Amino acid sequence: MDKYLIANINMFSLNNQVFLVDDLTREPCQIGAYSLADLPQALVQIAYDNDINIIKIAGNNKYSEKISDEIAIQENLLFREKKIKVEVI
């Protein structure tokens, strides 16, 4: 099991929590909270900084797919490669 990020999308909140789940503890640890506008770039940067390949988006709502698409765009703009797998849970 690899470490991964979980982004908790709440369309009624100004800040959406981001958690890191690592191999050893399997317990989520909050590492930040971001607006919907800043979330895709923040997730990509955190993933690359921590060598994470999986981002899970919790909160299956209309913003989940938009955030998923924006993550792919930000990853391409920032790093010119595709290594992050995004799952909507």
Which residues are covered by each model-predicted region?
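N-terminal basic/disordered segments at the start of proteins
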Residues: 2-14
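Short aromatic-glycine-(Arg/Gly/Cys) micro-motifs in beta-strand/loop hairpins
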Residues: 14-24
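Residue-level signature for short turns and capping positions that connect secondary-structure elements
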Residues: 25-26, 62
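A short, exposed loop/beta-hairpin motif centered on an aromatic-Gly-Thr core
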Residues: 26-37
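Long, charge-rich, low-complexity alpha-helical segments
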Residues: 37-88
